Design a protein with these regions (language model features):
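Conserved glycine-rich cofactor-binding loop
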Residues: 13-14
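Conserved glycine-rich Rossmann-like NAD(P)H-binding loop of the short-chain dehydrogenase/reductase
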Residues: 27-44
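Substrate-binding pocket helix/loop in short-chain dehydrogenase/reductase
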Residues: 96-97, 101-106
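Active-site helix of classical SDR
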Residues: 120, 156
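Residue(s) in the substrate-gating loop at a strand-loop-helix junction
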Residues: 140
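C-terminal beta-strand-loop-alpha-helix "lid" module of Rossmann-like NAD(P)-dependent dehydrogenases
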Residues: 172-223
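The beta1-alpha1 cofactor-binding region of Rossmann-like NAD(H)/NADP(H)-dependent oxidoreductases
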Residues: 59-70, 102
């Protein structure tokens, strides 16, 4: 189903993006890898090409218009069309919203939301002209369940939920399908990136310091149930290969459980369950 399809994957140098690129290449797709880390991209591209796959590595920053345009141009020059886009690039940050600088919050939205929209705006007209295409947005369980001390990142994923729903309705008449994939906890470099981005906020946490200590302790426990990147890559492949894809794919199992409980239980229960606690 995916053989010879040309698919762009952003954030392809590690984690979910890398696993997705590998899985799509195995399925016979022409995979275009996009991320900032040029050396990692080149190594992955060379590895996949050595097995007879057709790939293209484009190093760039998704927040830069020139890099987004170069990505689309390079893809068309090599493969002649774009059949699908996997919007995976993004990062998280943690800490009390009161202490997060507005420029840091804007930067998070720039990468996770606005750049995704901007790249989609470049690709959607091409798909409309073809009369077919598919866009898969990588959201998060955090787009449905906001945790205290994670509201900056979680709010970007809430925004993505609305954008995906709107795009789905707008592009469907033109044969373009839009799908959301919601990962739960996944073992990737995502947590390390969030720690780096949030370091200054943690250092100046003030009255929130003890709550952040508990938050980190609890987060470490959740790693025990975390899935692996290929759990999500498998869902992305399903979303791309299905003739009639679902609106949303959730995974792994713990993500489905949390979302079911969110649907089943009253909001006051979640406020209680997710309340901030101090480290002992």
């Amino acid at each position: 189903m995916l053989e010879t399809k040309t698919i762009i994957v952003t954030g392809a140098s590690s984690g979910i993006g890398e696993a997705t690129a590998r899985r799509l290449a195995r399925a016979g797709a022409n995979v275009v890898l996009f991320a900032r880390r040029a050396e990692r991209l080149a190594a992955l591209c060379a590895e996949l090409d050595s097995t007879g796959k057709h790939t293209l590595a484009v190093a760039g920053d998704v927040t830069l218009a020139a890099d987004r345009e170069r990505l689309v141009r390079a893809t068309l020059e090599k493969f002649g069309r774009i059949d699908a886009l996997v919007n995976n690039a993004g990062y998280g940050q943690r800490g009390p919203l009161e202490r997060i600088p507005l420029e840091a919050l804007r930067a998070n939205f720039e990468t996770n939301v606005f750049s995704l929209v901007a790249l989609t705006q470049l690709v959607a007209p091409l798909m409309r002209a073809q009369g077919a295409g598919r866009i898969v947005n990588i959201g998060s369980v955090a787009g449905r369940i906001t945790r205290p001390l994670s509201s900056a990142y979680d709010s970007t994923k809430f925004a993505l939920e609305g954008i995906t729903d709107g795009l789905r309705g707008e592009l469907k008449p033109f044969g373009v399908q839009v799908v959301l994939v919601r990962p739960g906890f996944i073992r990737t470099e995502f947590g390390q990136t969030a720690e780096s981005v949030s370091a200054q906020v943690y250092a100046d946490a003030g009255p929130y310091a003890s709550y952040l200590d508990y938050f980190e302790t609890n987060r470490a426990k959740l790693r025990r149930v975390a899935g692996v990147p290929d759990d999500i890559a498998r869902l992305v492949e399903k979303a791309l290969a299905a003739r009639r894809p679902r609106r949303c794919y959730n995974g792994p199992l713990h993500a489905k459980f949390f979302l079911f409980m969110k649907w089943l239980l009253p909001a006051c229960f979640f406020d209680w369950a997710l309340r901030m606690k101090k480290a002992e």
